């Protein structure tokens, strides 16, 4: 190998900050592999314009950048106050009234956007407002009114979120707005579609059906942010198996299950998703201080590094790039931390699933290739010649310090593999098949500077290049 590649990928959120001063190009140049469009904000026209710009810049820079559309999900929030904000003291009585109109809130009461809240709570439940900064204990429920007492005081302003400690709010995962946004996602041609607040696998299956009906074949991302989704191993598996990608959305999830539980859940989700051949994104407040500061805190550095050590495919930036003062600097800082963490030898130790039966020939080839790569002295890279990107995903589920090159003629496949840990997408097309095509691919990587003469590489491919799911061959070649 002639160059060192970052294995952990970076997801960046688009917003006003990336719209100005050529920041979008700077962010992609700094190392963004996936861009996230938050459908909570902006019009369909805004999203289409940003997507077009991303593709234009990616082509200009010779990069493959995936586009992730993030559905808003149910709005479980307080309504608005007359003065815009109140301060609640410990011991205050406070009413949540589903019948109260917007702008009528005060120090004693406020409306709620989610009209099903009174049916979801009972006396003794703890409600967490504004990510837990204000906490209320339910005293009584009368019709559409929830009477509470303040147990943790503080300021409360318009439209702050409501969570229930331990989960249990029954709001549907997909709203009418989400269904409209799925059509926008289809129009844009997003590579990934994130579903907010799924309660179970069926929520994700429903989203997938709606997406297909709209003409959107994006991979489905499960944003794990409800306590119900992680309350047991079966619940966790149900969500993971129904998705293509898992996002550890630590904000709402941490509020519902409590911060002490979050550490173990993050590690369990990442570990289990990799076992089940799913990709993983770790998100929320990873470099929050860089919204206003040019350097991350040491705690943020450790947080990103620990996610890398856990085995995450990608780490995500939200407000840091969408609305921060230093969007490209934040991406560059995160890239440096990832590279630093990837130097630690333990994360490259093979964890082969030798006790697990493989589901298909493709998986058997991917696992055997990685076993050979990790045990044959002198191997410098793995090359997957892929139509769908599936083999690249499965090879990347096995820990290794070796780069994996996903080589495909399909732009969408290359964009999808931009998310996968350790995978570098490279455009490749050939009229040849078999060993001739494999040699051609190896020579292309050598000419691009990824390989050097004398390198030993492992290639996976099918008998015919243009057939999806046909991977059935592993070759070991020496670069000429």
Swiss-Prot record:
Cofactor(s) listed in the protein's UniProt record: Mg(2+); K(+)
EC no. given is 2.7.1.40
Gene Ontology terms for molecular function: AMP binding; ATP binding; identical protein binding; kinase activity; magnesium ion binding; potassium ion binding; pyruvate kinase activity
On whether Magnesium is a keyword of this UniProt record, the answer is: yes
Amino-acid positions noted as binding ATP in the UniProt annotation, renumbered to this chain: 38-41, 77, 160
Which top EC class applies here? transferase
Positions modified as N6-acetyllysine? 351
The residues that hold K(+) are: 38, 40, 70
- List ligand-binding residues for substrate: 36, 223, 251-252, 284
Q: Out of the domains of life, which is the source?
A: Bacteria
Free-text activity regulation comment from the record = Allosterically activated by AMP and by several sugar phosphates. Belongs to type II PK.
**Which residues are listed under the site Transition state stabilizer?**
223
Quaternary structure and interacting proteins, as annotated: Homotetramer.
Spell out the family assignment given in the record's similarity comment.
Belongs to the pyruvate kinase family.
- State the protein's purpose: Catalyzes the formation of pyruvate in the last step of glycolysis, it is irreversible under physiological conditions. The reaction is critical for the control of metabolic flux in the second part of glycolysis.
Record-given protein name: Pyruvate kinase II
Origin organism of this chain? Answer: Escherichia coli (strain K12)
């Amino acid at each position: 190998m002639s160059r060192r590649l970052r294995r952990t990928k970076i997801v960046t959120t688009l917003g006003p900050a990336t719209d100005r001063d050529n920041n979008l190009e700077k962010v992609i140049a700094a190392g963004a592999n996936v861009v996230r469009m938050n459908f909570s904000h902006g019009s369909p026209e805004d999203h289409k314009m940003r997507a077009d710009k991303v593709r234009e810049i990616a082509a200009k820079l010779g990069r493959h950048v995936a586009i992730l559309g993030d559905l808003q999900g149910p709005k479980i929030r307080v309504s608005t106050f007359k003065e815009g904000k109140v301060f609640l003291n410990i011991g205050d009585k406070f009413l949540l009234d589903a019948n109260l109109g917007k702008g009528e809130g005060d120090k004693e009461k406020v409306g709620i956007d989610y009209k099903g809240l009174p049916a979801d709570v009972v006396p003794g439940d703890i409600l967490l407002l504004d990510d837990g900064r204000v906490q209320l204990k339910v005293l009584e429920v009368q019709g559409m009114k929830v009477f509470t007492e303040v147990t943790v005081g503080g300021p409360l302003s318009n439209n702050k979120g409501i969570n229930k400690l331990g989960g249990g709010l029954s709001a549907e995962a997909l709203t009418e707005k989400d269904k409209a946004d799925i059509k926008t996602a289809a129009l844009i041609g997003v590579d990934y579609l994130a579903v907010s607040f799924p309660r179970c696998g069926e929520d994700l299956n429903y989203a997938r059906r709606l997406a297909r009906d709209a003409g959107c074949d994006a991979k489905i991302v499960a944003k794990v942010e409800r306590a119900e989704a992680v309350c047991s191993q079966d619940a966790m598996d149900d969500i993971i198996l129904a998705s293509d990608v898992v996002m550890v959305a630590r904000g709402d999830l941490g509020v519902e299950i409590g911060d002490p539980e979050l550490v173990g859940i993050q590690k369990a989700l990442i570990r289990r998703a990799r076992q089940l051949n799913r990709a993983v994104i770790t998100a929320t407040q990873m470099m929050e201080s860089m919204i206003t500061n040019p350097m991350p805190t040491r705690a943020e550095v450790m947080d990103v590094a620990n996610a890398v050590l856990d085995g995450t495919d990608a780490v995500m930036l939200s407000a840091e790039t969408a609305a921060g003062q230093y969007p490209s600097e934040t991406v560059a800082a995160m890239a440096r931390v990832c590279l630093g963490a990837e130097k630690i030898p333990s994360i490259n130790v093979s964890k082969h699933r030798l006790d697990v039966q493989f589901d298909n020939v493709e998986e058997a080839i991917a696992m055997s290739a990685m076993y050979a790569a990790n045990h044959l002295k002198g191997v410098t890279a793995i090359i997957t010649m892929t139509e769908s990107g599936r083999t690249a995903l499965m090879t990347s589920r096995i820990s290794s310090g070796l780069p994996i090159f996903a080589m495909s003629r399909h732009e969408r496949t290359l964009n999808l593999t931009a998310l996968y840990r350790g995978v570098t997408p490279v455009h490749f097309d050939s009229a040849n098949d078999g060993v001739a095509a494999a040699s051609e691919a190896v020579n292309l990587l050598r000419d691009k500077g990824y390989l050097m003469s004398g390198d030993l590489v492992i290639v996976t491919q099918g008998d015919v290049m243009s057939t999806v799911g046909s991977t059935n061959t592993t070759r070991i070649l020496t670069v000429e």
